[in-house]
């Protein structure tokens, strides 16, 4: 069990621009020239971890391909380019680390080489075998830019049970486990790795079965457990928070194991759909149909118990025990709203409404809102009215999916500015009013409010930005039989290109012109066609898409 909080001082690591210079990259002529860097040694992060020297680590290759982001408009380049450079460096040069077999390969599933995984980030002690961070980072970007590292990062979270069967590592943060299923299905869609699919399906079936037995509330049709993001008590109002408890961990507070949260239940819905997809891909039609039915019932329950018709949005959680049992907490949960749109829990009308009504702070989307009674503008709650870039980025992607080009533009530029204000580093948490690096306030082991540290070089903050670029701006939508393009290009950003993108056995360059999210025309290698590449594509392809507001 790991609660994100205080940690040791930041480890030394290779400077961002130094890393990209070594990798043969740079920032010139409107181009982040980071194309096609493969076989790149993982030595910067290894050094930061106290791992083998470059000579010893030479055999440990990460195999990344870093797509180039090209800008026709210098203002757009100035606003967004440095953050893209920093995000790639954070993922590849800082947070890709050696996977010590005794720690990370307990199930015997990792590949050596590359022998690396994506860790959570700076400031926290090693090892960082954290399911939630691993799944988010693979889902956001790692599975695309390095399928082998993405695969290792996911499989490092798997353990073998005494009977030899596979399951996501079991601990007392059970609500973290199910996002692994969503991320694993995405990895298969991106890579087409059938060997991975077989292990992922077994792992996902066993993980879901365990959670259904232990954490499903049959009366309400929802899964119990804290919010996806909020393992710290600062993410909850009173109740369940109460004074005098000497802990920051959510489960140390009464009845928190019984709450039923929007974000977590949306992820279970996504996991059921992922299991349906995996089962179909493995030709297990009976299991697929069962998982589809489970998904439909859960979606109905979420919309019955958590949708607020009066507010045109979702509430945060349903109390599962105590005096408020059965009542909906009406706070707004940033990750929950994002997942409701991203995973399809919200119908189109609901998605439009919640995007219209979502609360923005001056520097972005926050973890939860409004401020709970124990916090204030001077002492913002760590998991309350603070900007976590990972959550903010998920909401940005949701805005793109929902066709809100304006909100998507705001999300991307807000995070780029936060990063610029913190010397190009992707920190863990920011003050939602000022944009300063700020870990927020939370009850600690003394039972009193304490100011926590915002840790540097957090991989999921960086991959969140990459998610907004790859999946939001360029609209990379991976399906079983094709990569489909659904871009979201804000007005005034000018022509943009993503060059050298890997997709299974092919690569492609994608150029966007116009503005909006409606595809007016698409050419593939100069010929008019659908905005898609088939999964069986090979070689290199040129894709050009013209957009308007529709």
Over which residues does each language-model region extend?
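Active-site neighborhood of glycoside hydrolase catalytic domains
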Residues: 265-305
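Short helix-capping/linker segments at secondary-structure and domain boundaries
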Residues: 32-38, 145-149, 345-351, 403-406, ...
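Long alpha-helical scaffolds in large eukaryotic adaptor/regulatory proteins
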Residues: 30, 148, 191, 279-282, ...
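Aromatic-rich carbohydrate-recognition surfaces in CAZymes
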Residues: 127-242, 261-269, 386-399, 405-408, ...
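Extended glycan-interaction surfaces of carbohydrate-active proteins
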Residues: 74-127, 148-170, 217-259, 300-389, ...
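N-terminal secretory signal peptides
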Residues: 1-18, 25-29, 33-34, 38-44
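Acidic/polar, glycine-enriched structural segments that form the non-catalytic walls/loops
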Residues: 44-127, 194-196, 205-212, 279-287, ...
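Non-catalytic C-terminal accessory modules of carbohydrate-active enzymes
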Residues: 394, 398-550
């Amino acid at each position: 069990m790991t609660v994100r909080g205080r940690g040791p001082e930041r480890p030394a690591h290779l400077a961002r621009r130094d890393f990209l210079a070594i990798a043969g990259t740079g920032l010139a002529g409107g181009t982040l020239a980071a194309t096609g860097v493969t076989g790149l040694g993982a030595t910067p992060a290894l050094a930061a971890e106290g791992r083998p020297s470059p000579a010893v680590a030479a055999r440990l290759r990460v195999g990344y391909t870093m797509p180039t982001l090209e800008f026709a408009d210098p203002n757009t380049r100035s606003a967004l380019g440095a953050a893209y450079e920093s995000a790639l460096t954070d993922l590849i040069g800082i947070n890709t680390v050696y996977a010590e077999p005794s720690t990370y390969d307990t199930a015997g599933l990792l590949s050596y080489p590359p022998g690396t995984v994506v860790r959570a980030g700076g400031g926290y002690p090693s090892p960082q075998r954290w399911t939630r961070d691993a799944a988010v980072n693979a889902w956001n970007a790692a599975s695309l830019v390095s399928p082998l590292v993405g695969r290792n990062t996911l499989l490092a979270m798997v353990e073998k049970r005494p009977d030899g069967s596979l399951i996501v590592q079991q601990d007392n943060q059970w609500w973290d486990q199910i996002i692994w299923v969503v991320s694993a299905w995405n990895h298969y869609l991106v890579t087409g790795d059938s060997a991975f699919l077989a292990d992922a399906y077994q792992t996902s079936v066993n993980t879901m079965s365990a959670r259904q037995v232990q954490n499903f509330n049959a009366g309400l049709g929802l899964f119990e457990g804290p919010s996806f993001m909020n393992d710290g008590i600062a993410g909850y109002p009173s109740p369940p928070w109460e004074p005098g408890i000497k802990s920051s961990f959510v489960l140390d507070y009464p009845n928190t194991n019984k709450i039923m949260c929007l974000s977590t239940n949306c992820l279970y819905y996504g996991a059921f759909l992922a299991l349906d997809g995996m089962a179909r891909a493995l030709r297990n039609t009976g299991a697929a149909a069962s998982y589809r039915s489970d998904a439909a019932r859960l979606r109905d329950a979420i919309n019955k118990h958590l949708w607020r018709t009066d507010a045109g949005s979702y509430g945060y959680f349903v109390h599962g025990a105590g005096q408020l049992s059965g009542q909906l907490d009406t706070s707004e949960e940033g990750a929950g709203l994002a997942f409701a749109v991203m995973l399809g829990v919200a119908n189109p009308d609901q998605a439009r409404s919640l995007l219209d009504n979502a609360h923005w702070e001056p520097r972005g989307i926050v973890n939860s809102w409004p401020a709970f009674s124990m916090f204030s503008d001077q002492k913002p709650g760590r998991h309350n009215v603070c900007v976590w870039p990972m959550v903010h980025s998920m909401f940005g992607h949701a805005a793109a999916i929902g066709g809100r080009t304006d909100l998507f533009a705001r999300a991307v530029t807000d995070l780029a500015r936060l990063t610029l204000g913190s010397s190009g580093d992707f920190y863990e948490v920011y003050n939602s009013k000022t944009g300063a690096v700020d870990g927020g306030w939370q009850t600690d082991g003394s039972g009193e409010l304490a100011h926590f540290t915002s840790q540097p070089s957090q991989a999921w903050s960086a991959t969140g930005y990459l998610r907004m670029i790859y999946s939001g701006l360029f609209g990379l939508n991976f399906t079983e039989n094709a990569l489909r393009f659904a871009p979201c290009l804000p007005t005034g950003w000018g022509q943009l290109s993503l060059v050298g993108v890997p997709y299974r056995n092919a690569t492609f360059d994608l150029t966007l012109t116009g503005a909006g999210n409606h595809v007016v025309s698409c050419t593939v290698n100069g010929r008019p066609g659908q905005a898609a590449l088939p999964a069986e594509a090979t070689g290199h392809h040129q894709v050009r898409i013209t957009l308007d507001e529709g």
